[in-house]
Amino acid sequence: MAKPLTDSEKRKQISVRGLAGLGDVAEVRKSFNRHLHFTLVKDRNVATPRDYLFALAHTVRDHLVGRWIRTQQHYYERDPKRIYYLSLEFYMGRTLQNTMVNLGLQNACDEAIYQLGLDLEELEEIEEDAGLGNGGLGRLAACFLDSMATLGLAAYGYGIRYEFGIFNQKIVNGWQVEEADDWLRYGNPWEKARPEYMLPVHFYGRVEHTPDGVKWLDTQVVLAMPYDTPVPGYKNNTVNTMRLWSAKAPNDFKLQDFNVGDYIEAVLDRNLAENISRVLYPNDNFFEGKELRLKQEYFVVAATLQDIIRRFKSSKFGCRDPVRTCFETFPDKVAIQLNDTHPALSIPELMRILVDVEKVDWDKAWEITKKTCAYTNHTVLPEALERWPVSMFEKLLPRHLEIIYAINQRHLDHVAALFPGDVDRLRRMSVIEEGDCKRINMAHLCVIGSHAVNGVARIHSEIVKQSVFKDFYELEPEKFQNKTNGITPRRWLLLCNPGLADTIVEKIGEEFLTDLSQLKKLLPLVNDEVFIRDVAKVKQENKLKFSAFLEKEYKVKINPSSMFDVHVKRIHEYKRQLLNCLHVVTLYNRIKRDPAKAFVPRTVMIGGKAAPGYHMAKLIIKLVTSIGDVVNHDPVVGDRLKVIFLENYRVSLAEKVIPAADLSQQISTAGAEASGTGNMKFMLNGALTIGTMDGANVEMAEEAGAENLFIFGLQVEDVEALDRKGYNAREYYDHLPELKQAVDQISSGFFSPKEPNCFKDIVNMLMHHDRFKVFADYEAYMQCQAQVDQLYRNPKEWTKKVIRNIACSGKFSSDRTITEYAREIWGVEPSDLQIPPPNVPRD
């Protein structure tokens, strides 16, 4: 008789191995049916389209989960170095389609849903965007997570689970109005709460120096509840984790004040603690020193570092070897990447844990911290740099303030020893800025406390070294690197532009999806008549589809054979949507002046959100909509020029407009845009770029040949020279009649007859204090736009340039970017190892 199984042996039956995957259409249908009835508790008589979406999401998620568990088991066994990407923003967009694409499930799901009498595309459109970011910085983090999973890195994204993401933008009477983005209202099928890993985060209190070391006492505690979202790599069975923290009040919150007798009041006040993760701050490239924001920054850092250290200590390696409780090996097992200065508190927090809690001596702790942390700089705009008042730290994080002072003192002692008597250098390099309000310069803290500092495009990294952190570069040049940004080709080609992806696959196979440099193989096809026709046909189909979408969603009818001239990004003076406006007004005036002349028809689309408190940006939106009101209703103009403001620009709208664009506008003042990634998305999707020599545009021109982009305007050196000389806007206004006419029309109320003074602030800024020198580039921009028109008249030559651009866009994959981070900053190698799927036994 067989020996009875032990409990431990019985438990081996609890395994992901025995669970069927989604091999075929029948299984998808079965799983969909099961989830509709058993998970959502609906039948077809009462199910809503959203129920069908959720049933499909749970079906796809089932397929993910086995791989997710397997991946974590694999990491536990191999114990690789872990990469922790810390960011206050992850702009993920929608998840369903991306998950199906990366798991290779799209065709099976499409067919199953079709067989059930439903439409997959209609279901996909119901899903909310996860809008936990403002723009480029948050979207970069999302692309990076995709690439890290695809490259088999043991990586984790850590951030905040904002209850309300970036606001929804409504346009009312031409003005932006913000609405709360209640993205979790119907639940989120992709996240898994992990209350068992809930962690305390401390605020306020006081510091006591005792013989046993330093104690941070009498703090207020907020709990951080983790929610995990799977991040699937592309067809490699790797599923990484994005862990977002949500704030919860502890059960005894304020109840220690019970003698006050107001139990109800105490429970209601739990909201105060939980407000920490309530809402994303909607500022892009602008620092607003609010205490709640500082709380958010410390909240994510404190929870994440506890989690990192828990994982470090409990790893398999640590069980076998006492070395793990000694932190010497910490930088060999942990890399922390700071996405801008927002998670800068990681540096003093790691020091606090090592010195105060783990009793590591200061110098050793500092060495560990520096080897572990690396910092990515994303902007050179002075108004965007984080400078927190010391008084706020004193109250909120008193121990961290002491640690920052100590870090700064040692740093300044070091600088003083190297540059004796150079007092001004000490002032410039201090973490503490003296003045009426003493401030902590978070960028300086990041540079001092990291072993690597990188910019996000070559030109930006040079500006970082020669200007923003010049003194620090002179001190430690080996620290500074460049890592040109990239985008994931899975979302930004395969998912959003399947027609173009298929056309490319027919010619060069599928390898380019994980090695975008393979697109170079398209270069010999640049004169291939059939390929030229195929590429042009895909673009026309995308334009027709987007035209239909505009008509349905925005009730706007456009001419699909016009040039789609697209300018979509956050609204900011440095991005110069105003330069685009001046071009549009000038074109309008030319049509009115000579209506019989042949014009290349254009549909100009401008989209993007303005920070709610940014008056000028909101006024720019009003100007765009007002110009549209005049131009679009002028019978003389007809179909030749249309101006559309794309309301509520977000990831899911980008996925529609980018594949349809002919012309991509990337026209920031040289030296202002760190990199840009929209520029890369348009390039990969077959739009031509009009742009300045700024950010990644420089490298795009280098890759594709400047003659295959429309480059214009001042370069960084010219901008600097103009600053030294003194920029005088009036000179341009007086000498360029078309510019003068356009500015006068805006100024006089031609576009705002009911409010003639509506745009006086814009004109005043342009004439008297325009930091971004719009007028200085106007003439060159107009000439460049004329070249665009000329080429567009020759569709074949236009498409040849498009093909060259697509073929040369390989550098701009986030896979390449992440490979560089891995090798040159984190000290890990990407892996093309396929983790066995759940139905295959492990080694």
Curated annotation (Swiss-Prot):
N6-(pyridoxal phosphate)lysine PTM sites in chain numbering: 681
Alphabetically ordered keywords of this record: Acetylation, Allosteric enzyme, Carbohydrate metabolism, Glycogen metabolism, Glycosyltransferase, Phosphoprotein, Pyridoxal phosphate, Transferase
Cellular component per GO, a single term: cytoplasm
EC number: 2.4.1.1
Site residues by UniProt (May be involved in allosteric control): 156
Residues the UniProt record annotates as site (Involved in the association of subunits): 109, 143
PTM annotation (Phosphotyrosine): residues: 197, 473
Record-linked Pfam families: Phosphorylase
Activity regulation note: Activity of phosphorylase is controlled both by allosteric means (through the non-covalent binding of metabolites) and by covalent modification. Thus AMP allosterically activates, whereas ATP, ADP, and glucose-6-phosphate allosterically inhibit, phosphorylase B.
Keyword Acetylation: yes
Assembly notes: Homodimer. Dimers associate into a tetramer to form the enzymatically active phosphorylase A.
Family statement drawn from the similarity comment of this UniProt entry: Belongs to the glycogen phosphorylase family.
UniProt name for this protein: Glycogen phosphorylase, brain form
Organism from which the protein derives: Pongo abelii (Sumatran orangutan)
